Amino acid sequence: YKHSDQAKPGFDYDVVSNESLRLDGASTVNLLLGAMRYLLNPDDAIARAQLSYEFAKLYEPERPFTDVFAVTNHSFFESNLPLEFTKDKGSLKKLPLFELTETLISIFKLGEHPGEIAYLLAFQNLVLEFYSRERNDLGAFLEWWEENKGKKSVQVSGEVNAVQILTIHKAKGLQFKYVIIPF
């Protein structure tokens, strides 16, 4: 609606919901996780497909799906990824978990996506928290992530200049200047 002919100048149409702030919905976070899964098990076709898909979604959205999912051919698959990632797989896998995360962000240039920076920072905080509380193990982190990914989101202040979409259960007890209840 924001970009339609019916949008009125001077009005903001930004919307925020709990689901839109979840880390598992961020493209950059999913690319990081795909790269981590691939480093953990390069022979896993699903890990290769996920990495290929997430990379194409961010950097090559016009690329045909037949090319994106042609992951059985290792050389073709790796030719589409950054050279620094493909040639240093062995040394990347040996890095401590937090350092691996930062290195992958740098290799894939994920910090260049301004709308995703809050998600990356929140994900890095989770990695650091896991690293300091649990252990420095990529496999354990990925397992923990699968169990907890739906609970992790970017925290925003109440001063966000956007319409907040809440369920009645989440909104119970809260006060807002304006409330819209659809029927």
Task: Set out the residue ranges of the language-model regions.
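Core structural elements
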Residues: 1, 92-108
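Conserved motor-region signature of P-loop NTPase helicases/translocases
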Residues: 1-48, 106-111, 118-151, 155-180
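A generic short alpha-helical patch detector that favors 3-5-residue windows
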Residues: 24, 92-96, 115
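Metal-dependent DNA phosphodiester-chemistry modules and their immediately adjacent helices/loops
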Residues: 30-74
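Charged/polar, low-hydrophobicity segments characteristic of intrinsically disordered regions
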Residues: 62-80, 153-162
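Charge-patterned, long linear interaction tracts outside catalytic cores
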Residues: 71-99
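Residue-level marker of regulatory loop/turn positions in helix-turn-helix DNA-binding domains and
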Residues: 89, 93, 112, 157
